Amino acid sequence: LEMLRRVSIKGGLGNVYEYAGPGAATLEVPQRATITNMGAELGATTSIFPADEQVRKFMKSQGREDEYRELLPDEDAEYDEVIDLDLSSLQPLVACPHQPDNVKPLSEVEKLPVQQVFIGSCTNASYADIAKAALVFKGHKVNDNVSCTCAIASRQTYKALMEDGYLGMLMDAGVRILEIACGPCCAIGQTPATEGIA
């Protein structure tokens, strides 16, 4: 969202974004997938991270460590532009209607009542993301005036969340679990409420 705020939905046209640096090195593969997936919102040709130790650990957890190959930028690589993001200074952001680059600090919109909540998608529905949401909902109920849905990114993640009890926590709170497919992101299955805030 910070990149969208800075360069807009057309800022990436004809560009490949490569994310690197000390902050990027700490991100696990699902977090990196969220960022690279959102390159489409920037209009980017593609987005990449180095295939480093984090990638090796992820592939090992998937039983595919033997397929891992380190892929790092050349030491003398040249770039058209370098954009520095200080991850420690970022504040929570939210994309507002009607384009993904209409980005506002959460502090500007946190008092607005919402009628719809959508957790997940292929972009940010990793095990850790959904488990955190489930723990927030544990012992609580979705407000009667709110439609709350959750989409999980993969069958593997869905099964692990189910086995570990996180889907039950969400369902007990009144969250509707969607099928593993495209959905609310492209306006399928959760039509925004008239005059509502989603």
Where are the predicted features?
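Fe-S-dependent hydro-lyases/dehydratases of central metabolism
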Residues: L1-A198
